[in-house]
A protein has these predicted regions:
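Radical SAM enzyme core and accessory elements
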Residues: 1-57
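Conserved alpha-helical substructure of the radical SAM core
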Residues: 3-5, 43-122, 126-146
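Flexible, active-site-adjacent loop/turn segments at secondary-structure boundaries
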Residues: 58, 81, 181-184, 214-218, ...
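Flexible loop residues that form catalytic
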Residues: 87, 123, 176, 215, ...
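Alpha-helix N-cap and loop-to-helix initiation/capping positions
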Residues: 93-97, 101, 187-191, 220, ...
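A C-terminal junction/extension of Radical SAM enzymes
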Residues: 221, 225, 234, 238-273
């Protein structure tokens, strides 16, 4: 799995099962490769010293300063644009990076590669019981580096205060609708109340600004964009409509089945222009 600058956003992306980090010759990019073992026995993991430190550049010459670390592949929702209804076969726990390994990866990225901000994703990062420990380790070593998570918000109500105290700076919450029925249809779980309580908990913990990421799907929730925007404005949240990516395990994604930015603006302009 490559650890490189994202061509769209100039950020670095690391997956949950990465074991080695080295500097790619010639272009300053760093790559992380999965572990391999002919016997099937997991070898001892080591992150070698970076021999060529310095900023990471993508093919367009942009410097990547953000690192996104996927902490797990597990998720407690089954969003129709992301995962099949029956879920997936999760990675064995022993194959995931430990809190210590994640902290070391972050330290290398910050001290050797010029990373200035770290975001934790998944799967769903809140399913990691050691998330507070991960945040705390990195924050204690690098207190000036912003730390953020992208989450569905389930369970955040109970953990927001501890995460903020550990050093978490801000959150992005994935929320496509505030209609309970639509949420249940999209996420295949009736968990809207838990998400909204999680957002309230984050606000009470001082995790500002709270950013909301929403995916609009034609015929499902695209007509609810104005309602979602009104709710976000009332709460003081930053709302961003993001592109539906071809990540669904059912491989049913088509560009014709997505909604464009122009179409979103048209739906919003009727009420807000």
């Amino acid at each position: 799995m490559a650890y490189t600058a994202n061509s769209a956003s100039s950020e670095l992306i690391a997956g949950p099962t990465l074991s080695t980090l080295s500097s790619a010759e010639g272009n300053g990019a760093a790559f992380v490769t999965p572990e391999k073992s002919e016997s099937g026995v997991k070898p001892a993991r080591k992150l070698p010293n970076i021999t060529n430190s310095g900023p990471l550049l993508d093919r367009w010459g942009r410097v990547a300063t953000d690192l996104r670390i996927s902490l797990t592949d597990k998720c407690n929702l089954r969003c129709i644009y992301c995962m099949p209804a029956d879920g997936l076969q999760w990675l064995p726990k022993e194959n995931l990076l430990s809190a210590e390994e994640i902290a070391r990866l972050a330290d290398i990225a910050i001290t050797e590669l010029g990373v200035e901000e770290i975001r934790f994703t998944g799967g769903e990062p809140l399913v990691r019981a050691d998330l507070v420990d991960i945040i705390s380790r990195i924050h204690q070593a690098h207190p000036d580096v912003p730390l953020a998570i992208t989450t569905n918000g389930i369970g955040l109500e109970k953990r927001a205060a501890a995460l903020a105290e550990a050093g978490l700076t801000r959150i992005n919450v994935s929320l496509d609708t505030i209609c309970r029925e639509t949420f249940a249809a999209l996420a295949r779980r009736d968990k809207l109340d838990a998400v909204l309580k999680g957002i309230d908990g984050a606000a009470e913990a001082g995790l500002w600004p709270i950013k909301i990421n929403a995916v609009l799907m034609p015929g499902l929730n695209d007509d609810q964009a104005p309602e979602l925007l009104h709710w976000a404005l009332a709460g003081g949240y930053q709302l961003r409509f993001i592109e539906q990516m071809p990540l669904d395990a059912d491989n049913r994604w088509t560009r014709e089945g997505t909604i464009t930015a122009a179409e979103i603006r048209e739906k919003l302009s009727a009420e807000y222009v």
